[in-house]
């Protein structure tokens, strides 16, 4: 059902590899291409780990069957993609919060059995969306916290982002109902 569309995604990912910021980002894109070409879930895990551990790029992306919001059982995910770039000034402010994640975990108003003793690998940054695709289009949440895989999060951490230009757009759109007072 998705073969023709995913072939175009792979074609464009191969083109994008030439513009990767570094070898690590080329590896991430390569693993995603390999996953799309094989459908191998082990390769998807390798891609996810490489993606979550690649925290340096100014330009990043999410691409794949990521969120399962539309499936009540949480088993079937829909395809989505976002290409984004880092807002460096806003990220500096967010990194202060990220650096104190353990304090926030320890002092959160949550029952002790749900708290993590050792918060690991939280990479928080502020981004600006350049393009949205799939289930993210035409609008998306104001933040992303991935991967969804609990074992990957526990062993390799997660990426947590706030999408600044969408947050701003949603705030602006809430200032009125769109009608002129005449």
Can you say where each PLM-predicted feature lies in the sequence?
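Fold-level signature of zinc-dependent metallopeptidase catalytic domains
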Residues: 1-182
């Amino acid at each position: 059902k998705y073969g023709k569309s995913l072939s175009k995604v792979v074609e464009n990912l191969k083109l994008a590899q030439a513009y990767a910021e570094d070898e690590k980002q080329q590896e991430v894109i390569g693993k995603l291409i390999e996953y799309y070409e094989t459908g191998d879930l082990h390769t998807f895990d390798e891609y996810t780990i490489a993606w979550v551990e690649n925290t340096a790029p100014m330009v990043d992306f999410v691409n794949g069957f990521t969120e399962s919001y539309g499936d009540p059982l949480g088993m079937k995910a829909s395809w989505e993609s976002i290409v984004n770039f880092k807002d460096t000034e806003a990220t500096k402010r967010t990194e202060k919060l990220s650096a104190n994640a353990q304090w926030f975990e320890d002092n959160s108003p949550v029952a002790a059995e749900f708290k993590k003793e050792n918060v690991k690998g939280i990479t928080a940054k502020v981004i600006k969306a350049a393009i949205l695709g799939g289930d993210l289009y035409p609008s998306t949440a104001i933040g992303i916290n991935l991967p969804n895989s609990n074992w990957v999060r526990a062993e390799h951490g997660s990426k947590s982002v706030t999408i600044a230009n969408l947050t701003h757009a949603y705030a602006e759109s809430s200032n009125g109902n769109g009608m002129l007072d005449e």
